[in-house]
Amino acid sequence: MNMAKMIKVKQTKSAIGRLPKHKATLTGLGLRRIGHVRELEDTPSVRGMINRVFYMVEVVEE
């Protein structure tokens, strides 16, 4: 069984007053509110999304 590497991403700051592109990126990551944690596949596209909103999220677990 080929298991993809997963990472956990947690939203640490609010999206209120942020750039619309950054709000859309949070939505694309599946994050809705402060403290929300999602487990996502570790791909270059997901890493790029995390880098775009680095000031609002943290990688909890790799």
From Swiss-Prot:
Keyword Thylakoid: no
Domain of life: Bacteria
InterPro entries for the chain: Ribo_uL30_ferredoxin-like_sf, Ribosomal_uL30_bac-type, Ribosomal_uL30_CS, Ribosomal_uL30_ferredoxin-like
GO MF term (any one): structural constituent of ribosome
PROSITE patterns: RIBOSOMAL_L30
GO biological process: translation
One cellular component (GO) term of this entry: cytosolic large ribosomal subunit
Gene3D superfamilies in alphabetical order: Ribosomal protein L30, ferredoxin-like fold domain (3.30.1390.20)
Family the UniProt entry places it in: Belongs to the universal ribosomal protein uL30 family.
Subunit structure: Part of the 50S ribosomal subunit.
PANTHER family on file: LARGE RIBOSOMAL SUBUNIT PROTEIN UL30M (PTHR15892:SF2), MITOCHONDRIAL RIBOSOMAL PROTEIN L30 (PTHR15892)
UniProt name for this protein: Large ribosomal subunit protein uL30
Provenance organism: Pseudoalteromonas atlantica (strain T6c / ATCC BAA-1087)
Name of encoding gene: rpmD
